[in-house]
Amino acid sequence: MRASALALVLTAALLAGCGSSGSSGTTAKPNGEASKPASRVLADAEAAATNARSAHISGDITSGGTPITVDLTTARGKGGKGSMSTNGLKFDLVRIGDTVYVRGSDAFYKHFAGAAVAQLLHNRWLKGSATHGRLKSLAELTNLRSLFAHISADPGKIVNDGKTTYKGQQVVTLRSVGDDSKLYVAATGKPYPVAIVGNKNGQSGTVTFGDWNKPVSLSAPSDALDISQFGG
């Protein structure tokens, strides 16, 4: 559940606005999560998220002094799209099925491939396998199930601090005793994750979840260079 877990998976992937709660029905009825044990609320939030048809994930995190910005849209069983950056290294990402497309900034390409290659790849898309090879870890950023597996794995001691309001929405607060980060879960309708907020131990910032089950349009970039041609 920790914000650090999310920060670590985002950073690891790179280096290998707050949306609405989405469609949970027209009536916002209490869902009973406020009275459940923290572990049950976490499991319910993970189940709601991973069974959603789509979601939008966005925010800014600082992990160990490293700033990370993420803006991703995922579509279950289809793929996803968005962008991510850290320390000035930005890339755009599209995954459609088993194929992933990546377009890095000049700084991104220079960092990973050198100045000469960066010049050749200026504003160019690369494509490769989403299931193996160099781009697999980036492709996993568009898989909500994979992201939440990292967030919920070995959460340490967490407590249910009960119901509160976060940016106008009724939520249940799960708090990590170890690093004081918080996961806000919708207190009405389906128990979708609303936000993760980090507070200390080198982790700070907020990642929000929203636009649940909204339609997502994905299209493959044209003229993408196949990374397998470069031994990837």
Protein language model features and the residues they cover:
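N-terminal leader/targeting segments and the immediate start of mature chains
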Residues: 2-69, 223-232
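Primarily hydrophobic membrane-targeting regions of prokaryotic envelope proteins
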Residues: 3, 18-19, 55-58, 100, ...
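N-terminal mature ectodomain segment of secretory-pathway/periplasmic proteins
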Residues: 40-108
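Gly/Pro-enriched, hydrophobic low-complexity segments
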Residues: 60, 162-225
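Short, surface-exposed beta-strand-loop junctions and turns on beta-sheet-rich folds
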Residues: 88-89, 108-110, 191, 201-202
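Acidic/charged, solvent-exposed loop-and-adjacent secondary-structure segments enriched in E/D, K/R, S/T
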Residues: 103-146
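A short, amphipathic edge element
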Residues: 151-159
